[in-house]
């Protein structure tokens, strides 16, 4: 039952997301894109890859989709194995304890999803598909095989936008940055002897750690599974090595020979027993149990797993099995021996080692923060690990059932219990730190959330333990993780964002693309390199000048070597070149124009604050962009993109119908005024007309925060940078009233209110218009069912849904029994539990959803009916709201002036916003000034005089930039945008207005006049257009006042905080202020009757009602609590009056209180409540 469409269909195919990719900064490769004039000088040989690929590719690997198999085949992987298949292969076969029966699984496959995305959101369902596997039971005694297709539960599926819908809410699984399994060599200095000590850890994906070290006495030791240290030769002997073999392999090393001499164990048996005693102290050791223990610890796949990536890292570091495919994922004897040899050579200062296969490997320590040693666990792997946990729990159940059930009657279905698997998946999506409520403030915040990299979470770091090193920017982050975008608080450096061009390889390492350079010639051949591969090469930056043939213009080129060293080298030595100047930054950072002129701290704030911008009623793309706006908007998935080329057949506010060239008809439905996760308004509107031709990949409808398919987070406002009467001191902002009147910065916010009718012990609750003791005026907007009508204006306290709950009934009097007999159930006692608009909220009802058990809707147990009401609120900009630019320049509105009082230009145009000059120099975000200048140039248009040839400053500009019309939109890509000289020249070449005046001089300043007096200001002022965003920190959400409200149960003091409708805390320092002024009575009142003197509160109310004098305050409740606490410590505390008589804290006060309260009609049984509705 849908009344007022809330959530419209939103369908978009995968192809539409990945077709038509724009070039670096012009939007030419996306059909129908707005023509943004670009100041870019460099050609980018590679288009920006799909920005959601990190999510979608990983999930496709997990489910083993056809598209993933095709791309794996292209990479040369002959037998690709999906994530689910991998888990089933690991698990199979499950054998019983005697080995006579086995159960194996294969061929995971999915049915159709149960309901489309919009229905799942609407009905609080999970967007999931049923998973089936083939289970095969083999009786080894008889050779009998039973095969069945088994249902393994509903598996949450990823939407085309890279999200999951769990119980109706959209969630994102964040990729996790973890230390890769492998061998890590470390170097420390001993505090007492200043000697260099070396150690190595063999870290598996799953299993016991193995650690070797050389101590200050020059002995080589080993720790198995974090237990006590032993000589390393004990482990070698336990592995079956004789003294002669150790001599033969390690004869070159004095420290190994010294360790062998100190080792007292005679042979393999004794060494095994010695290890067993250390690992299992207190248990009687036997040779067999010791042998089994060691084998299980490191050499059995069930207990120890290096994972493919760990095997790859170990082989690479130690030079083992070079060029051979990865097969085993356990440790081998050779791994252990090669690790010890590497450690010994490292300690002895050698720089290279020849591995057993003849491969020479460098001997060096490892940097744990290097991106060659940190990898990403993407969505697919995180879910796979959770399924593995569920499957191993199921394995135990299967084993037990094999032994208890009758062999003849056993089928795969009777053995399998899918509950542990389903529970494990549910637990991950519902409660994991990495499964997060999607940030839907605007399209950019959603896109950034999907590209987020987190070092926190299970198996990762914790905020408390993470030091500075792991948080810091590392040279290996270049092109992989953005050095700018990270949170400002305790998570700084632990949460990052994937760089624009980065991708994740099958091992989970982040790769970034480079152009191959051959003999000093830069080719368009693209190679993706991981961080440790990049270390072996010399890389030039993207803006190194090259000629038309791709040769470096200068003989010596600035390059980057290992560990971030920068130097000039001959061009013949260069191996690779960056593909783009914006390669190192993330999407949000790449949307900051003139980023190269901003301090990194402010750029960080700018990138983060773009994600907090609220969608405005009318979106406006920036005059000064970076060329990233279009791709970001398309890949965020909030715009509607045409799947196929064709002609628009029909357009309305709700849908667009396209007749494709192949004769098929496709209808795209618009989302109309839907509520996002963050209460902002997600609305789509068509930007095409009937009869218009569209191409595949063209944007046909705008979403929130987009204009013509480009990201549009704010507004272009005319800004003057000057102090004004001190009203814009300390980042305060002065606004023109025009922005309020014309709804320039107005946003729509939608709140969802929900109520359900349940079965209670006293009877069923009822949603009804028949509410006791409520006037007809209050019920005026309710329909006959008791639900508010769509379009009704509501404010706090208004009833949205009428509901009554049965009261506990007492013994009926004869009169009541008579009434009950005449009127039936109508007269029974009910109380009003209606859904009311919370305190401080108001708006217009825009939609209602009713779910009822009678209509066969799925509802939780005990719930008969559920009603949701959506209330939209139009919020104009007001004092106290927070505004920000894209350069970390943020401020709170301090004053809104009438337009006629604002400073104005010589032609009478008043400015929209005044920012203080002090906000620029010490913050070093000069980008905002350059943006202001270029904004003015773009708004005015320009024409460069080329009568005497192109001026020197315009020499690098493309021909189409020599002139532009007013209101042109421009892009200045990061690190490749407009230069300072070009800006100065363009300011001098701006077109005059209709009166023939050029209002802003070549220095970017204008003569401004005071709007109040008409007098000119004594100095010229910087004036231009800046892109300003309205952030989610709105004063309406923060302002709060309390009259009467809830009290804490124990202390009887008012609760705190807006959510609890709490009071303002009058703290210790405020009390001092009162004391300083001698305001004794005011202070006494604050500490007693206004706080927790329960008797006094009621008596004061009584006195006010009766017009009497306010009585003396009583004893605060918290004082009584203090006495009780002291008495609980066995301290007998008495309260004495000034004359030494004991004061009796009477319990009878409560009775007086109840009596007075009853006379006044006050309900004192109110307890601590989380919701304001319960206060009435």
Swiss-Prot record:
Q: Which reaction does it catalyse?
A: RNA(n) + a ribonucleoside 5'-triphosphate = RNA(n+1) + diphosphate
Q: Where is this region: Disordered?
A: 13-35
The Gene Ontology biological process terms listed for this entry are:
DNA-templated transcription
The GO terms this record gives for MF are:
DNA binding; DNA-directed RNA polymerase activity; ribonucleoside binding
Family matches, as HAMAP family: RNApol_bact_RpoB
NCBIfam families assigned = PRK00405.1, rpoB
UniProt record similarity statement:
Belongs to the RNA polymerase beta chain family.
Briefly state the protein's biological role: DNA-dependent RNA polymerase catalyzes the transcription of DNA into RNA using the four ribonucleoside triphosphates as substrates.
The protein's name: DNA-directed RNA polymerase subunit beta
Q: Which organism is it from?
A: Mycobacterium marinum (strain ATCC BAA-535 / M)
């Amino acid at each position: 039952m849908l009344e007022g469409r809330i959530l419209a269909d939103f369908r978009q195919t995968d192809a539409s997301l990945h077709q038509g990719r724009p070039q670096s900064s012009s939007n030419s490769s996306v059909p129908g894109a707005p023509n943004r004039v670009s100041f870019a000088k460099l050609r980018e040989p590679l288009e920006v890859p799909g920005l959601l690929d990190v999510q979608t590719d990983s999930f496709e690997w997990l489910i083993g989709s056809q598209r993933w198999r095709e791309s794996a085949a292209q990479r040369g992987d002959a037998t690709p194995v999906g994530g689910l298949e991998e888990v089933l292969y690991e698990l199979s076969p499950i054998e019983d304890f005697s080995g006579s029966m086995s159960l194996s699984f294969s061929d995971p496959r999915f049915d159709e999803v149960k309901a489309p995305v919009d229905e799942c959101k609407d009905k609080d369902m999970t967007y999931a598909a049923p998973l089936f596997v083939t289970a095969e039971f083999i009786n080894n005694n008889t050779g009998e095989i039973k095969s069945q297709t088994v249902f393994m539960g509903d598996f949450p599926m990823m939407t085309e936008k890279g999200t999951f819908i769990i119980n109706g809410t959209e969630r994102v699984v964040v990729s996790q940055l973890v230390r890769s399994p492998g061998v890590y060599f470390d170097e420390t200095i001993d505090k007492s002897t200043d000697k260099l000590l070396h150690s190595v850890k063999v870290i598996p994906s799953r299993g016991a750690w193995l650690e070797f070290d050389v101590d200050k006495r020059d002995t080589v030791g080993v720790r198995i599974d974090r237990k006590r240290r032993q000589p390393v030769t004990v482990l070698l002997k336990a592995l079956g090595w004789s003294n002669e073999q150790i001599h033969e392999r390690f004869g070159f090393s004095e420290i190994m020979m010294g360790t062998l001499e100190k080792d007292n164990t005679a042979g393999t048996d004794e060494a095994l027993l010695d290890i067993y005693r250390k690992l299992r102290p207190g248990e009687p050791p036997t040779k067999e149990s010791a042998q089994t223990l060691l084998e299980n610890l490191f050499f059995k796949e069930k207990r120890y797993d290096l994972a493919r990536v760990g095997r790859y890292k170990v082989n690479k570091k130690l030079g083992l099995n070079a060029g051979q495919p990865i097969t085993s994922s356990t440790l081998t004897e050779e791994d252990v021996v090669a690790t010890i040899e590497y450690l010994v050579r490292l300690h002895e200062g050698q720089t290279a080692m020849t591995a057993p296969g003849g491969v020479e490997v460098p001997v060096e320590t490892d940097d744990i923060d290097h991106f060659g040693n940190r990898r990403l666990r993407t969505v697919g792997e995180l879910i796979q690990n959770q399924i593995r946990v569920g499957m191993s729990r199921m394995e135990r159940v299967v084993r037990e059932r094999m032994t208890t059930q009758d062999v003849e009657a056993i089928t795969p279905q009777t053995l399998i219990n899918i509950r542990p698997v389903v529970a494990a998946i549910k637990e991950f999506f519902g409660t994991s730190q990495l499964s997060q409520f999607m940030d839907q403030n605007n399209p950019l915040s959603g896109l950034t959330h999907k590209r987020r990299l987190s070092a926190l979470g299970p198996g990762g770091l914790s905020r408390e333990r993470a030091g500075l090193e792991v948080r810091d920017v590392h040279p290996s982050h270049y092109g992989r993780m953005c050095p700018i975008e990270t949170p400002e608080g305790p998570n700084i450096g632990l949460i990052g964002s994937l760089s624009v061009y980065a991708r994740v390889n099958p091992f989970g390492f982040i790769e970034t693309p480079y152009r191959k350079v051959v003999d000093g010639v830069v080719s368009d051949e693209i190679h993706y390199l991981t961080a440790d591969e990049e270390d072996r090469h010399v890389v030039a930056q993207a803006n190194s000048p090259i000629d038309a043939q791709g040769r470096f213009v200068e003989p010596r080129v600035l390059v980057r070597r290992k560990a971030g060293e920068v130097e000039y080298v001959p061009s013949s030595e260069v191996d690779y070149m960056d593909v783009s100047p914006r390669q190192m930054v993330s999407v949000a950072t790449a949307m900051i124009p003139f980023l190269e002129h901003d301090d990194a701290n402010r750029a960080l704030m700018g990138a983060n604050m773009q994600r907090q911008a609220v969608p405005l009623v009318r979106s406006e793309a920036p005059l000064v962009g970076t060329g990233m706006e279009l791709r970001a908007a398309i890949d965020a998935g909030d715009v509607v993109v045409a799947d196929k080329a064709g002609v628009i057949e029909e357009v309305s506010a709700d849908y667009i119908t396209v007749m494709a060239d192949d004769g098929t008809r496709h209808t795209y439905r618009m989302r109309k005024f839907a509520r996002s996760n963050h209460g902002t308004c997600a609305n789509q509107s068509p930007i095409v007309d009937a009869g218009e031709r569209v191409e595949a990949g063209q944007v046909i409808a705008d979403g929130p925060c987009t204009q013509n398919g480009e990201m549009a987070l704010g507004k272009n406002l005319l800004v003057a940078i000057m102090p004004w009467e001190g009203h814009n001191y300390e980042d305060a902002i002065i606004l023109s009233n025009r922005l309020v009147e014309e709804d320039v910065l107005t946003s729509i916010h939608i709140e969802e209110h929900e109520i359900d009718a349940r079965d209670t012990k006293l009877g069923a609750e009822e949603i009804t218009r028949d509410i006791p003791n409520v006037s007809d005026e209050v019920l005026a907007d309710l329909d006959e069912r008791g639900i508010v009508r769509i379009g009704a204006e509501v404010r706090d306290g208004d009833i949205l849904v009428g509901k009554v709950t049965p009261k506990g009934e007492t013994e009926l009097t004869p009169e009541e029994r008579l009434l009950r007999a005449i009127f039936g159930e109508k007269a029974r006692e009910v109380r009003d539990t209606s859904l009311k608009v919370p305190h401080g909220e108001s708006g217009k009802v825009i939609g209602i959803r009713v779910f009822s058990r009678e209509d066969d809707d799925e509802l939780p147990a005990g719930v008969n009916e559920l009603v949701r009401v959506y209330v939209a609120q139009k919020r104009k900009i007001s004092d106290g709201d927070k505004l920000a630019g894209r350069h970390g320049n943020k401020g709170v509105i301090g004053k809104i002036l009438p337009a006629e009082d604002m400073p104005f230009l010589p032609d009478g145009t008043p400015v929209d916003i005044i920012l203080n000059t002090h906000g620029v120099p010490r913050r070093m975000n000069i980008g905002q000034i350059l943006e202001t200048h270029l904004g003015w140039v773009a708004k005015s248009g320009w024409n460069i005089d080329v009568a005497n040839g192109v001026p020197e400053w315009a020499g690098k500009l493309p021909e189409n930039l020599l002139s532009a019309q007013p209101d042109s939109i421009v892009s200045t890509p990061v690190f490749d945008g407009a230069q300072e000289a070009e800006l100065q020249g363009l300011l001098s070449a701006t077109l005059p207005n209709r009166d023939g005046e050029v209002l802003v001089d070549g220095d970017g300043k204008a003569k401004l006049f005071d709007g109040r007096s008409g007098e000119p200001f004594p100095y010229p002022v910087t004036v231009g257009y800046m892109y300003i965003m309205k952030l989610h920190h709105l004063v309406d959400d923060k302002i709060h006042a309390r009259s009467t409200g809830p009290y804490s149960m124990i202390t009887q003091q008012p609760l705190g905080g807006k959510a609890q409708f709490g009071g303002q805390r009058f703290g210790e320092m405020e009390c001092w202020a009162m004391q300083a002024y001698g305001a004794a009575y005011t202070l006494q009142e604050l500490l007693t009757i206004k706080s927790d003197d329960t008797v006094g509160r009621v008596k004061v109310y009584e006195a006010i009602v009766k017009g009497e004098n306010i009585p003396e305050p009583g004893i605060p409740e918290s004082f009584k609590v203090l006495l009780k606490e002291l008495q609980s410590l066995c301290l007998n505390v008495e309260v004495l009056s000034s004359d030494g008589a004991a004061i009796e804290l009477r319990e009878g006060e409560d009775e007086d209180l109840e009596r007075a309260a009853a006379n006044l009609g006050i309900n004192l049984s109110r307890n601590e409540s989380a919701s304001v509705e319960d206060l009435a």
